Every structure is written in C-alpha cells, then in structure tokens.
Amino acid sequence: MRMSCNGCRVLRKGCSENCSIRPCLQWIKSAESQANATVFLAKFYGRAGLMNLLNTGPDHLRPAIFRSLLYEACGRIVNPIYGSVGLLWSGNWHLCQAAVEAVMRGSPVTPIACDAAVTGQAPPFNNKLCDIRHVSSRDENVKRRSRGACKEERNVRSLSHESSLSHESPVSSEETTTEEPKTWIGLELTLGLEPLARGNHVVVPMKKRKLERCGTSEDEDTCKIELGLVCSE
C-alpha cells in the first residue's frame, strides 16, 4: 500500500501516483518542514488555488513553481508593499530567506515596519519606460474606430431622413389643398314584373320601400315588391 506524501497528509486529500505535491517537496529534507511549507502555502493561496497554480506547469517545473510560490508569499508578508521583488531590489533578500526558514520551522514570520517599507528603495516599476499603461491596445483602437463609424453612419441617416421629410412636405401640402369635385349620382333600381317608365325619376328610399299585396281573388297569395333605382345628375 502506497503511503500519502506529507503535503497530501496535512491537506487531508487523497494521494495518488500522479500526485502534484509529492515532487514539489523533494528539495525539502525534513518531513516536518514539508508539512509546514504546504500548510503555509495552502493558507496563503488557498487549497484549490495552490493546486491550480502547481498544475499549470509541467511535471519537471513543479518543484520550481512550489519554491517560487513559497518565496513570493514570504516576501509579501515581510514587505506587503513591494513583496519579494522589492526585497531583492533593495538588497534585503536575506529577510526573505529568513522568513522562508521560519516557515520551515513552523515559526511566525515577522514583517518589517510600514514606514521602512514605504521609504525603502522601490523597484523601478514607476519608471515611464517600464510602464505599459500608456500603450494603447489594438482592441481599444478597433473599438474607437467602430464607434466613430457608427456615429458617422447615424449622422448620415439623420441628414437623409431630414432631407426626405423636406421633400415630402410640399407634396403633402398640395395633396391636402386639392379638393375633389362634388358630384351626386342618383340611382334607381327596379325589381318587379312590370318595367318602370324612363320618364319617372322617383328615387325610392330604403325605409319607404313598398310591399304591396294584390287583392284579386285569383292571386291571393302573390306579393309584389318594388325597388327603385334612378340615375340622376
């Protein structure tokens, strides 16, 4: 049965043949120091964050990644402003090395005073030559060009719309001023057995249509409907 490595044991996780932590601890001689370093990094970066950072590199680079994370975390605790890079630049790398040794022993790390961290010699990150914030990215240039093109297109559309409205306005006024000639046509529609004489131009309204019933003894059940439609100018 394969035993778990010291890193997986303190993290209380299963250790397999493809363990990411086991090769990272080979440069540390003591088992207690391996456990202390793993617990310290798990508290600083988080358990999931530590595993993700270790798994980003290939297998032969994972020990170097583990050591780099350890020195960076210790340097950040000693100098919260500039970290391990600031300690290296200011000539105080021995403070970072002492912090790493304290972590191996399980002792607390003592940070430097805030005044000393602020007034100390800072790395040249504030130099304009090293600052890349003034360099505009290609995506920003594309966005600016697209915004300018959209504004020009909107202006052209608004101008064309206004010109079309100005051309349409006199036509609409002419159409409103024209009046159709008022002509009245009277139609007379007749429906019956007997034709209506052309000389009679009487228009029978709809409400006054006559329903006449013949009173002869021969056709008692017959009805006569007269509907008149006369055309008159």
Swiss-Prot record:
Q: List, in alphabetical order, the GO biological process terms annotated in this UniProt record.
A: response to gibberellin
For this protein, the record's Pfam families field holds: LOB
Q: In which tissues is it expressed?
A: Expressed in roots and flowers.
Compositionally biased residues, Low complexity: 161-175
LOB domain ranges (all copies) = 3-109
- What PROSITE patterns does UniProt report for this protein, alphabetically? LOB
Q: Which family does it belong to?
A: Belongs to the LOB domain-containing protein family.
PANTHER family under this entry?
LOB DOMAIN-CONTAINING PROTEIN 38, LOB DOMAIN-CONTAINING PROTEIN 40
Can you say what this protein is called?
LOB domain-containing protein 40
